[in-house]
């Protein structure tokens, strides 16, 4: 695995779009451990819960958490770090007075563009709320066409950054057509259990999955 810490110096998340290129490289860990008051937004509640377990001094804001809990946390936390779902960001707006003191990190922001599990009004409200904060990092490890971003008012003039890794593991995905995906998946598992691993040749070397 590749981690941002490998760059050898403290990493500063930028104000704008950051294409990590590699998932799980430690960008949200930077946000949780740096010296800034930070709001980390994610569309995945389970991911937020996992991060909260790893960093118990954070505040987890998802459904069921009200503004009183947020205000109580802000009054006592020395360096507040808030983990929040996309659809709960609005709860923070009235509780945080000096928004210029804060940084916002939006993880998996490509979900705002393509995830059909989000209603359009949730996406629009989230983007409107994010405008309240002057420093926002939009994170993604998914290739996003620049032309596509340029068609969206919120992103078209935003600074765009990309991490440049010296070495990257190339993942090749093979699609299998089947009328019964469950049986096909079970068959693939059986192949692995029996030691029959798929392989490809790269630069003359056979590499197994």
What are these regions (language model features)?
Residues 1-14:
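Pre-Walker A adenine-sensing motif
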Residues 37-51, 83-85, 185-209:
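Conserved strand-helix element at the start of the C-terminal RecA-like helicase core
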Residues 143-192:
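Interdomain hinge/linker at the junction between the two RecA-like core domains of SF2 helicases
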Residues 86-88, 95-137:
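SF2 helicase catalytic motif II
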Residues 55-95:
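Inter-Walker segment of RecA-like/P-loop motor cores
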Residues 14-18, 37-39, 80-81, 103, ...:
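Residue-level preference for the first positions of well-ordered beta-strands
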Residues 12-33:
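Walker A/P-loop
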Residues 26, 45-48, 87-93, 109-118, ...:
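Short acidic, S/G/P-rich loop/turn micro-motifs used as interaction or catalytic elements
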